[in-house]
Amino acid sequence: MILNCAIIDEDPEALQLLEQYIEKTPTLHLIGAYKSAIDAVDGIHHNHLDILFLAIHMQQISGLEFAKVVPKNVKIVFTTAFKEYAIEAYKVNAFDYLLKPITYDDFMGSCQKVFERYMQDDNYNPIKRDGFLVVKRDYKCVRIPIDDILFVDCSNSNDEPFIL
């Protein structure tokens, strides 16, 4: 399953760090990285988005205010250096709350929670939505377009799927 993400953060270092974490994670796809909530409006409302990494402190509009206009199906993960906003964040349907500086382990823990929530949804079909099958190959994950698969065979000796 590939989850589409976006980042909104005025801090260039925080933005770059989250971009690197997403690029490092084969099951995440970055739709956009924005320096303000205003810049992100079109990208968020015109793309299928699963996760939004959203800073709280921003100049034009706070992340807490912006969260109120984010589509309800999007999982919002707030990213901030201020733990005192946690209660307010959950009041606007935060899915998770990460304190800066964000480690890769914390980032992955949050993403894992999002994956698990989507997997619990009976109506969620990642192959139908994404159009890709993700398989492990030579110690990394590879995305294979569903339309390119002719058949899958698991009859070899070590029970690894053979995809053609």
Describe the function of each predicted region.
Residues 34-36, 57-58, 129-135:
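Short gly/ser/thr-rich secondary-structure transition/capping motifs
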Residues 112-164:
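Conserved binding/recognition cores within well-folded domains
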